[in-house]
Every structure is written in structure tokens, then in C-alpha cells.
A protein has these predicted regions:
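Positively charged, proline/Ser/Thr-rich regional signature most characteristic
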Residues: 32-107, 116, 187-252, 256
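C-terminal soluble interaction/assembly domains
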Residues: 247, 257-309
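Thiolate-centered catalytic microenvironments shared by cysteine-dependent enzyme domains
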Residues: 90-185, 189, 209, 269-286, ...
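Classical Sec-dependent N-terminal signal peptides that target proteins to the secretory pathway
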Residues: 3-31
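Short active-site oxyanion
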Residues: 46-50, 139-140, 259-260, 284
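Short, structured coil segments at secondary-structure junctions
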Residues: 65-67, 137, 219, 282, ...
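Active-site neighborhoods of enzymes that stabilize oxyanions during catalysis
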Residues: 36, 80, 148-221, 301-331
Length: 331
């Protein structure tokens, strides 16, 4: 009798464990694109979960980081490069595979991207890395709401110091080219249907100010201005609630029924716009014009409008701005 009872208990515990693993993996697969620090607490230092921390410097990471996280820098590690004078373009697929593999990440891992959490540029960099993973066909990926700042400010959360070089893995991608738009796609939207989303500030959209690598002031005809700061709460890395984001796009006249293309000066800020529409609001046909105005504005055959007629776009030149341009935003 005791033997029978023992066998039954063994079978029960075995299947209970299988059910637990099933629902644990289900939770990972269907996790939201934005997760909070409480969700992350129970996920740190797990074999199939990789926390990728984006920092301004290795020194910042060494001072304090989430346990078992992996350090990266958006600029120095090579997440983007310049091609034909167009900055902030994704490198070749093979180079991206090598880069991600060097972090010890495989295509089956769940990746949580953690930015410093200090403002919209942090959010844009994190969203650009997220977009890169999605472009490579990665399935399981999220951003940490509030970034590392929100994690560190919770005294119940542990942090580590120092740096450990991750063990390299082979990363294999399944590229999804449908996420990228080119200038021909943009022209089709101008002349037919769909929406162009200008993610820059209203001053740049209207042509009051402009910044290299955009070579002309103003915006693309028929573009709708939805600045990045609208996506975030008070210049932090905390996203607005979904219902409020829906109101923003509804107010701006953007519908899910037709496709959308996001752009900015060089594809960085618009990565955040893409993330909100594609991942949070689940717009089914949203693309990123990665080359953005860096490509568009230098081709004088392509139209731009100066909404308040602040300048003559056909003659205006960037002058000194070109010399002072840096891929890294000012701190």
C-alpha cells in the first residue's frame, strides 16, 4: 500500500512539475513587450533569460547593474553604422549575428532590454535594439519599463558590481524584411494611402529648427507629427498607459486600418514610434524608414514642406551643424 501510494505521489509530482514548466514557458512566450521591475524580479539569473543592459559607459555598468545582466553600448558595440553618409543604419545580418552571439544570446533566449532610464534618447536606443532583434526574427523580447533607474530606486532589488565577459554563442536569425520601409514606400504613402509619422519635436516638424543629418528643414508631405515625448511619462523611460497611447494616435487621426511608416532624422527616434505602434498598440502594418530624413532630405528631387515657411528648403544648408554632428546625443 505504501509503495503504491509512493508511486502515485511520484507520478503526481512529476506531472505537476511538467505543468509548472509549461505555464512558466507560456508566460515567457506571451509576455508583454513592456515588462515592469516586479515581473523581472523572478526572472533574473535564469538560463534561458538574458538581461541586456544598455549603458553610456562600461564604467557605469561596473558600478551597478542588475544581477547576471549583460553590458552593451549602443554606439561603441556596433548596433548601428554609417553607410553612404547615412548614419545609424543596421549593419549586415552576419555582423549583427556575431554581435548578439558575443553577448551569449541565442535565438531561443528571452531577452529583456534595460536602458538607463534617463530620457527619450535612452528609450529610443532601447527601442532600436528591440527593433533589431525583431528584424532578425527574434520571438521573445521585452523592454523594462522605467529602465535601470526604476530598478535601482527600489531598495528591495539587488544590484551587482564588476564585469564578467559572457560566453559566446552562435546566433541564427530569420530576417523579417517587411519591417523596413524605403523611400519608394514613403512615396507610395504620399501619393496613395497610409500614414507617415514624424517622431521628431514639433519645432523640427514645422521647420523652425533642424539638425544634421537632415539637410533641409521641414518634413515629408502628409506626415503627421507625434513627438517621442508623447510616448513617455515626464521625460522618463516609463511608457504611457496603453489607453492613453490609443487616445494620442486617435487624436492625431491615425488608424490601424492602413499602414504606417515612422521616420525622424536618422531612424533612432522613430524606432520608439515604431515600437509603440507595432508592439504596444499592435498596429498590423507598421514599418520603420530607417534611413529617414538623412537620406530623404539630400535627394532634392524628393519633396519636403516647410509648414510655416520659415526657410527656403531648396537653398538652406546645414553649415556648421554638419561638423558638430555626433551619432551620440548630447548628455
Amino acid at each position: 500500500m505504501n509503495l503504491l501510494l509512493g508511486n502515485l505521489m511520484y507520478i503526481f509530482n512529476k506531472y505537476l512539475f511538467i505543468i509548472f514548466i509549461y505555464f512558466f514557458n507560456l508566460n515567457i512566450i506571451y509576455a508583454d513587450p513592456v515588462v515592469d521591475k516586479d515581473w523581472l524580479k523572478n526572472k533574473i539569473c535564469k538560463d534561458n533569460i538574458k538581461i541586456l543592459e544598455v549603458h553610456r559607459s562600461k564604467k557605469d555598468y561596473e558600478i551597478a547593474h542588475i544581477p547576471c545582466s549583460i553590458y552593451t553600448n549602443f554606439y561603441s558595440d556596433g548596433w548601428r553604422e554609417t553607410k553612404d553618409s547615412i548614419p545609424l543604419l543596421m549593419p549586415s545580418v552576419s555582423n549583427l549575428e556575431k554581435l548578439i552571439g558575443s553577448f551569449g544570446i541565442s535565438s531561443s533566449d528571452y531577452v529583456i532590454i534595460v536602458a538607463p532610464g534617463l530620457g527619450k534618447y535612452d528609450a529610443a536606443e532601447a527601442a532600436a535594439i528591440y527593433f533589431t532583434f525583431k528584424y532578425l526574427g527574434h520571438k521573445n523580447i521585452s523592454l523594462l519599463d522605467g529602465g535601470f533607474k526604476s530598478w535601482k530606486e527600489d531598495w528591495d532589488n539587488d544590484t551587482e558590481t564588476g564585469f564578467i565577459l559572457p560566453q559566446k554563442k552562435i546566433y541564427r536569425s530569420k530576417v523579417n524584411k517587411n519591417l523596413l520601409a524605403n523611400k519608394d514606400d514613403v512615396l507610395k504613402v504620399i501619393n496613395k494611402s497610409g500614414y507617415l509619422i514624424d517622431a521628431r519635436s514639433s519645432a523640427m516638424y514645422m521647420g523652425i529648427n533642424y539638425l544634421f543629418p537632415a539637410l533641409r528643414a521641414g518634413t515629408i508631405p502628409n506626415a503627421v507629427n507625434i513627438p517621442n515625448e508623447w510616448m513617455l511619462k515626464n521625460n522618463t523611460l516609463f511608457f504611457q498607459e496603453r489607453e492613453n497611447l490609443e487616445k494620442i494616435f486617435e487624436y492625431s487621426g491615425i488608424s490601424k486600418k492602413e499602414g504606417q511608416i515612422s521616420f525622424c532624422n536618422a531612424g533612432l527616434e522613430s524606432a520608439l514610434s515604431w515600437f509603440v505602434m507595432s508592439e504596444i498598440l499592435e498596429f498590423p502594418n507598421n514599418k520603420l524608414y530607417e534611413s529617414s530624413l538623412a537620406e530623404w532630405s539630400k535627394d532634392m528631387s524628393l519633396p519636403m514642406i516647410d509648414i510655416i515657411n520659415f526657410s527656403n528648403n531648396s537653398k538652406k544648408s546645414v553649415g556648421k551643424d554638419k561638423e558638430s554632428f555626433s551619432m551620440k546625443p548630447e548628455e
